[in-house]
Amino acid sequence: MAPKAEKKPASKAPAEKKPAAKKTASSTDGGKKRTKARKETYSSYIYKVLKQTHPDTGISQKAMSIMNSFVNDIFERIASEASKLAAYNKKSTISAREVQTAVRLILPGELAKHAVSEGTRAVTKYSSAQN
């Protein structure tokens, strides 16, 4: 039996990086690759808050998923209530006032007070940064 010849790697120029193809409606569009739709989550923000409050504590993927669902649910409830309040007052724009009132209606007692004060502080900080 003859000895096997050594395989040499093909000298190939490095492939150029192409910008990611956007998701298209039809897959037969000239052979373009479809990118996976991005799923937007609050994971990075939840993680930052966790590290501010408990620096030595981690969070599992399952717990992060639950927290993300929780934030989405609360956001949806507040947005829905704020939308109703704007409609009651015959306004087409949701303002900070509608959001604040929605928070007071949805969240119970002390939690609402803390949420309103933190929200007011965040809006003040944002407004001062704009000037």
UniProtKB/Swiss-Prot annotation:
What's a Gene Ontology MF term here?
Answer: protein heterodimerization activity
Which residues form the Glycyl lysine isopeptide (Lys-Gly) (interchain with G-Cter in ubiquitin) crosslink?
A: 125
Provide the positions where the record notes the PTM N6-acetyllysine: 7-8, 12, 17
S-S pairs: none
Q: Which compartments does it reside in?
A: Nucleus; Chromosome
Coiled-coil annotation: which residues?
Answer: none
Instruction: Provide the transmembrane region boundaries.
Output: none
Report the PTM annotation.
Monoubiquitinated by the UBC2-BRE1 complex to form H2BK123ub1. H2BK123ub1 gives a specific tag for epigenetic transcriptional activation and is also prerequisite for H3K4me and H3K79me formation. H2BK123ub1 also modulates the formation of double-strand breaks during meiosis and is a prerequisite for DNA-damage checkpoint activation.
Write out the ranges of the annotated region (Disordered). Answer: 1-38
Q: Which domain of life is it from?
A: Eukaryota
Q: Name one GO cellular component term.
A: site of double-strand break
Pfam families in the cross-refs? Histone
Which portions of the chain have biased composition (kind: Basic and acidic residues)?
A: 1-19
- Please give the CDD domains that the UniProt record associates with this protein: HFD_H2B
Kindly state which keywords UniProt assigns to this record, in alphabetical order. Acetylation, Chromosome, DNA-binding, Isopeptide bond, Nucleosome core, Nucleus, Phosphoprotein, Ubl conjugation
| SMART domains per UniProt | H2B
Modification sites for Phosphoserine: 11
> Where does the record put the Glycyl lysine isopeptide (Lys-Gly) (interchain with G-Cter in SUMO) cross-link?
7-8, 17-18
Q: What does this protein do?
A: Core component of nucleosome. Nucleosomes wrap and compact DNA into chromatin, limiting DNA accessibility to the cellular machineries which require DNA as a template. Histones thereby play a central role in transcription regulation, DNA repair, DNA replication and chromosomal stability. DNA accessibility is regulated via a complex set of post-translational modifications of histones, also called histone code, and nucleosome remodeling.
Its subunit composition reads: The nucleosome is a histone octamer containing two molecules each of H2A, H2B, H3 and H4 assembled in one H3-H4 heterotetramer and two H2A-H2B heterodimers. The octamer wraps approximately 147 bp of DNA.
The similarity comment for this entry is:
Belongs to the histone H2B family.
Write down what this protein is called: Histone H2B
Question: What organism is the protein native to?
Answer: Lodderomyces elongisporus (strain ATCC 11503 / CBS 2605 / JCM 1781 / NBRC 1676 / NRRL YB-4239) (Yeast)
Gene responsible for this protein: HTB1
